[in-house]
């Protein structure tokens, strides 16, 4: 019996090895950097809100058996184009964000469909294909926005375009600037729409999560006839969150250190709501027939075909949904930054999103919402804290920058090696 328990503990540790390792790295880096708890919490909330949707966009392709979708770069480009156009048309604020999202969605549907069709031609090689497709798309994007805008595509806007003089001495505008600043009303339009102090939000979150937990347990006991233990397990995500929030609420009342850490922390409510809605959309899709088809295709394409599922169509739909969600994620990301680096903002989107997902404990063939948020928190804490820790240790923040690059690509490499090892 003791040996069985020992094996079970080892199995759990092996399964959660990556998140545990990065949790330790985060704690050590925070300690070395000497940054205050309030700074770390504020920066983490900002970065989770900025990046979460991009990482959520990876879930459906993983479920569909296509691995980690590096081609979300195309969705990011679609979102960027929407933001560039609303800046050109001077549609500012939340209406501008909505218009940009609609434009991005349409473009992402087209690009996602083409990507899905390509993936159907290279089954089993989707990840490397998605990565190379991203590089190719970057080249096409640069060609359009450096040379074609203003010359082939009619557009004149001194605010966002480069100018030069022709032989006749006339000012002409060709190509976009490297950096396009959003108008004041568009910068942080979503984040600043509604903010609340964390100390006021915490009790409401606690009551909300507790209520949802009770409803799920009651539904499982009443409708599905499950016992209490199985019902609690079905609601484990909400239950664990409720317990954590409850402990935090107690500490807020009893610990001055915790009060100080959270005293100035603000939460962008609208951003959180949008992230929650996108997560609910993905979860809802997984509960529908389409979601069951996606899971079946991911497990075994031959079995799915025998069951009458249109495998190619299902894979295209999963790719389209991933690309569309990525376009929304890039819009949320860039409004938080306040500008768009026209030719650079999208380049590392896929790599950073994939790395964050893997840090959360996901793999090529399995990804959950819990892993999305665990990975987002851990990866981005390391992302902003390692340069500060490097500066303290070596008086050179550049070493921290090198570690960030090593961290990102190293995670992906190790994950692929472990996946191949398990298959042997």
Protein language model features and the residues they cover:
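Hydrophobic alpha-helical segments embedded in the membrane of multi-pass proteins
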Residues: 48-59, 77, 106-110, 275-276, ...
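Transmembrane alpha-helical segments in multi-pass inner-membrane proteins
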Residues: 68, 320-326, 330-405
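Membrane-interfacial amphipathic/re-entrant helices at transmembrane-helix boundaries
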Residues: 2-56, 92-95, 264
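Alpha-helical transmembrane segments within multi-pass membrane transporters and channels
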Residues: 91-138, 156
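Helix-loop-helix "hairpin" substructures at the membrane interface of multi-pass membrane proteins
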Residues: 200-209, 214, 227, 234-256, ...
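Cytosolic-side transmembrane-helix boundaries in multi-pass membrane proteins
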Residues: 1-26, 216-225, 229, 233-237, ...
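Single transmembrane alpha-helix segments in multi-pass membrane proteins
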Residues: 26, 39-89, 109-127, 357-366, ...
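Extracellular/periplasmic helix-loop junction at the C-terminal end of a transmembrane helix
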Residues: 138-196, 223-228, 237-260, 387-394
């Amino acid at each position: 019996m003791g040996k069985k328990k020992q094996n079970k503990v080892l199995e759990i540790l092996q399964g959660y090895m990556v998140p545990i390792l990065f949790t330790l790295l985060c704690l050590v880096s925070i300690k070395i950097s000497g940054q205050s708890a309030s700074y770390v919490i504020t920066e983490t909330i900002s970065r989770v809100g900025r990046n979460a949707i991009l990482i959520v966009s990876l879930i459906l392709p993983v479920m569909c058996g296509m691995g980690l979708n590096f081609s979300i770069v195309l969705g990011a480009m679609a979102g960027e184009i929407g933001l560039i156009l609303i800046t050109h048309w001077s549609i500012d604020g939340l209406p501008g964000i909505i218009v940009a999202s609609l434009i991005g969605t349409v473009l992402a549907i087209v690009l996602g469909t083409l990507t899905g069709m390509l993936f159907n031609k290279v089954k089993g090689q989707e990840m490397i294909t998605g990565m190379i497709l991203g590089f190719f798309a970057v080249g096409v994007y640069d060609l359009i926005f450096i040379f074609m805008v203003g010359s082939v595509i009619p557009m004149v806007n001194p605010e966002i375009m480069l100018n030069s003089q022709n032989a006749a001495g006339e000012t002409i505008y060709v190509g976009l600037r490297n950096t396009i600043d959003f108008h004041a009303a568009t910068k942080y339009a979503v984040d600043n729409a509604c903010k609340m102090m964390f100390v006021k939000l915490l009790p409401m979150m606690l009551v909300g999560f507790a209520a949802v937990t009770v409803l799920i347990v009651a539904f499982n006991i009443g409708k599905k006839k499950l016992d209490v233990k199985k019902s609690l397990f079905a609601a484990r995500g909400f239950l664990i969150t409720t317990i954590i929030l409850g402990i935090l609420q107690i500490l807020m009342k009893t610990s001055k250190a915790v009060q100080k850490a959270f005293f100035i922390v603000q939460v962008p409510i609208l951003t959180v709501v949008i992230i929650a809605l996108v997560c609910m959309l993905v979860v809802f899709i997984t509960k529908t027939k389409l979601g069951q088809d996606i899971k079946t295709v991911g497990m075994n394409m031959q079995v799915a075909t025998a069951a009458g599922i249109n495998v190619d169509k299902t894979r295209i739909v999963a790719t389209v949904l991933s690309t569309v969600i990525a376009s929304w994620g890039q819009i949320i990301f860039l409004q938080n930054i306040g500008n768009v680096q026209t030719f650079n903002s999208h380049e590392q989107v896929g790599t950073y999103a994939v790395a964050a997902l893997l840090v959360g404990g996901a793999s090529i063939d399995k990804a959950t919402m819990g892993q999305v948020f665990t990975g987002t928190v851990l990866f981005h804490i390391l992302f902003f804290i390692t340069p500060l820790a490097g500066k303290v240790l070596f008086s050179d923040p550049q070493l921290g920058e090198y570690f960030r690059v090593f961290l990102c690509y190293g995670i992906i490499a190790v994950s692929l090696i472990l996946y191949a090892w398990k298959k042997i």
